[in-house]
């Protein structure tokens, strides 16, 4: 699998990161995974900027706007605000409640 990496840096330190995958690598749709923002940077809204950059990278690199991700349940509203909608049932991944979400 070949991921593209979206990296956010501040003062030469990585503070935000995602991996993006072309359609068919994980899901039928393009996908975003491993969304991480350093704890001390979360209040600065870098998660929103990181996701916007990741969505844009998928649209440019893979020429699609249909994107799927596996979200931790407590972040459902965050992803809703970015245009993602729930698909399927809640499930556990590593003991943490998750939900599938798609953006069209």
Model-predicted segments: where are they?
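Short secondary-structure junction/hinge motifs that connect adjacent elements
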Residues: 1-5
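Conserved beta-strand in the GNAT
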Residues: 7, 13-22, 29-31, 36
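A conserved beta-turn-beta hairpin within the catalytic core of GNAT-like acetyltransferases
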Residues: 23-32, 42, 61-65, 95-98
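Conserved acetyl-CoA-binding loop-helix of GNAT-fold acetyltransferases
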Residues: 37, 43-56
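Residue-level recognition of the GNAT/N-acetyltransferase active site
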Residues: 38, 72
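Conserved short alpha-helix immediately C-terminal to the canonical SAM/SAH-binding motif I
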Residues: 50, 75-78
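Conserved GNAT acetyl-CoA-binding A-motif
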Residues: 51, 58-71
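Conserved catalytic-core motifs of GNAT/GCN5-like acyltransferases
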Residues: 68-70, 80, 85-100
